[in-house]
């Protein structure tokens, strides 16, 4: 499997969808995927090990998006599928169901989906960008609404290859993922109708700069769906962790609700609305057989679950919607 296999059909991003700059970007990525090494080679082999079959059913509009049923595969193919999927661990987002195999990911992402799915604009015929798309769980949930295009950006190769594993069987021709960070994405002014940015902004050293770039890539009147760590406060407060937050070194700014609204307005958005505030619990994020790393329980103070191990407030996430003006 090489670049040609991974990016098959991606020329449509320019030729059909008129998203400029993609062909040059794919050419620049060629050495990584044409001559894979390390984990990239490992994940390439995992994809090559997936059994070749056509799923008799594809049902993406459910908590665990489903491809195929048990009887679609022989016993040997089932073993082959399980081994290939397991080689792609850790699976952070899910759950999924592959031909009767229940893939219980670290995050029960359906919980987050249910918080906002009924409170945002319908995605039908829209051009959608998902920043930090991971393995595409939310992209596959979006697919049932028949968007014109969904483009995910995911620089972590683990999750990028997981997306291809799912879509090998889901066969969603209008879903695309690029293995790049948001910074590497050219500013396609006024292109996207809806942008999702979930669990990304607090990793940024310049959150306002990121919000401004998102704004510039959106149609006037387009909708931003933003999920972020927050402080449950209406004061002008922002937490800047001294070193780590919940054992994460790359967390920089955790704003209060009021500060988050101010950032969005300063970046050119209006009609800012906070549609959900939720404490992250072990029912939503926990260790499973499909990850080999720590999870939420390990990040909280064992003597006071309302604090992280560093002594900061435990993770609370809020979902905001806003309109580009």
From Swiss-Prot:
Matching CDD domains: AdoMet_MTases
Looking at the keywords, is Transferase present?
yes
Q: Which reaction does it catalyse?
A: carboxy-S-adenosyl-L-methionine + 5-hydroxyuridine(34) in tRNA = 5-carboxymethoxyuridine(34) in tRNA + S-adenosyl-L-homocysteine + H(+)
The UniProt keywords, alphabetically, are: Transferase, tRNA processing
Q: Give the E.C. number(s).
A: 2.5.1.-
UniProt-listed Pfam families? Methyltransf_9
Give the record's GO biological process terms.
tRNA wobble uridine modification
Q: Where does the chain bind carboxy-S-adenosyl-L-methionine?
A: 93, 107, 112, 132, 198, 202, 317
What terms describe the molecular function in GO for this protein? Answer: transferase activity, transferring alkyl or aryl (other than methyl) groups
> What NCBIfam families does the record tag this protein with?
PRK15068.1, tRNA 5-methoxyuridine(34)/uridine 5-oxyacetic acid(34) synthase CmoB
What does the sequence similarity comment in the record state about its family? Belongs to the class I-like SAM-binding methyltransferase superfamily. CmoB family.
Which proteins does it associate with, and in what oligomeric form? Homotetramer.
Q: What does this protein do?
A: Catalyzes carboxymethyl transfer from carboxy-S-adenosyl-L-methionine (Cx-SAM) to 5-hydroxyuridine (ho5U) to form 5-carboxymethoxyuridine (cmo5U) at position 34 in tRNAs.
Name this protein carries in UniProt: tRNA U34 carboxymethyltransferase
